Amino acid sequence: MPPARPAELLPGTLDLLILRTLVRGSNHGYGIAQRVKELSRDVFQVGESSLYPALQRLTLNGYVKPEWGVSDNNRRARYYTLTPAGRKQLAAEEREFERIVGAIRLVLELA
C-alpha cells in the first residue's frame, strides 16, 4: 500500500492546533510545525506559507507573544508563548470544534 499523503487541515483549525501546541511552553515556528506533524502522526504537515501568517494573526490578536531567543542548534529564532488571552481563546475554539465534530458524528451515524 502506498504511504498516506498528508491531509489538508480543515478551515479554521490551524489556529487551534498552534495554540494547543503552545500549552506546554514556548516554541519557535519550525518547532510548532514539527510538533503538529508529530502529534498527528504525520497526517498534518503545516507549511511556512500557512504557519507564519497564522502566527502573525495570533500575535496581532494578543493570543501569543513573540520573543527572540536561541534555538537548540544555536540559531536565532522567534519563540511564541501562549498568553492568558490565548488560553481563553483556545478553550473557546476547543468547545466550538467539539460541537462541530459532534454534529458531524451525528450526521454520519444517523444518515
Q: Where do the protein language model's features map onto the residues?
A:
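Accessory beta->alpha helical hairpin/"wing" motif in late/C-terminal subdomains of nucleic-acid enzymes
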Residues: L82-G86
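Beta-hairpin "wing" of winged helix-turn-helix
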Residues: T59-R76, T81
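Short beta-strand/turn micro-motifs at beta-sheet edges
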Residues: A4-E8, W68-G69
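Basic amphipathic alpha-helical segments that dock to polyanions
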Residues: L51-L58
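N-terminal helix-turn-helix DNA-binding core of bacterial DNA-binding proteins
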Residues: P6-S50
